[in-house]
A protein has these predicted regions:
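NAD(P)-dependent Rossmann-like dehydrogenase/reductase catalytic/cofactor-binding core
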Residues: 2-14, 29-33, 37-122
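Structural/interface elements that position substrates and couple domains in central-metabolism enzymes
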Residues: 20-26
Length: 122
């Protein structure tokens, strides 16, 4: 199958979600507080971390509703406010902006997969 096995103790979020989701959540806080625009946050993270997608591109791919659900599980399971979902993430999900699967999340997606437009901040 070409898979690599990793092991983790039984903790909320295990390994990947426990590290990845707070990064995505922090990107939402950076946008929410006006640190930078979404395009610059994504570009900075791609260039600065050598990731193939920025945090907003990845969140839209995963689904903003899924990201929010995981943040809520982490917050409840670990009891640490650093896992509290950003209000902007909650606002996007409440507005039905769920990401690629809905055609709009942080970015707007046309039916042509080569075309991605920036959408204004809620």
């Amino acid at each position: 199958l070409g898979k690599v096995v990793i092991t983790s103790h039984d903790y909320s979020g295990f390994i990947v979600n426990r590290i990845l989701m707070p990064m995505i959540n922090e990107a939402f806080f950076a946008l929410y507080t006006g640190v930078a625009c979404k395009e610059d946050i994504d570009t900075g993270m791609k260039l600065g971390t050598n990731h193939p997608m920025g945090p907003f591109e990845l969140a839209d791919f995963i689904g903003l509703d899924v990201c929010l659900s995981i943040m809520r599980v982490l917050h409840a399971g670990l009891g640490d406010n650093k896992y509290a979902p950003c209000p902007l993430l909650v606002q996007y999900v409440d507005a039905g902006r769920l990401g690629r699967k809905r055609g709009i999340g942080v970015y707007e997606y046309s039916k042509d997969p080569r075309s991605t437009k920036s959408s204004s901040r809620l």
